[in-house]
Amino acid sequence: MIMTNNTLVSKDLANKKLHVVREFNAPLEKVWKAWTESALLDKWWAPRPWKAETKTLDFREGGLWLYCMVGPDGTRHWCRVDFKTIAAQKSFTSTAVFSDDKGNRDNSFPAMHWSIVFIPTTTGSKVEVRISFDNEADLQKILEMGFEAGFSMGLGNLDELLASIN
């Protein structure tokens, strides 16, 4: 288990899973919106100096989020997230893949199966993210690409955003 910027990350290579926990000093409703509305997602999802740009977000079961990560030099990496289940202000599950700008999967990168749970706390809320992979090599590839540090940085951005919005 590794704690980075108030983000707890544990890796279970044998079971092909990552578990990320972060607490926020913000009400659950505000945290939920930041995870489910494109205008807010674009402000925190990418680790700086990268930015996230949403092309489309249809947050419903069977819907999708098509976005790109834009680097400081203009490099664009597209991703597609397909929403599977949604329990409003409680949890959602999805599958995320790298794609082209039309949402066609890039099979040279692994799929990530996300389960995100939102829990109210006495000081705000906690988000628990469980990510599973099809095999251990896929998990290793994502880790080698810097996922752990990048996602932790994004969650730090979310902390800043939540403090700045009413």
Regions found by a protein language model. Give the residues of each.
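A short, structured loop/turn motif at beta-sheet edges
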Residues: 28-29, 58-60, 84-91, 117-126
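A conserved amphipathic terminal alpha-helix motif
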Residues: 2-3, 134-166
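Hydrophobic ligand-binding cavity/cleft-lining segments
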Residues: 1-51
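Short, surface-exposed coil-to-beta transition loops
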Residues: 19, 52, 76-81, 110-114
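Short coil/turn motifs at secondary-structure junctions
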Residues: 27, 72-74, 86-88, 99-101, ...
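Glycine-rich portal/gate segments that line the openings of hydrophobic small-molecule binding cavities
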Residues: 53-99
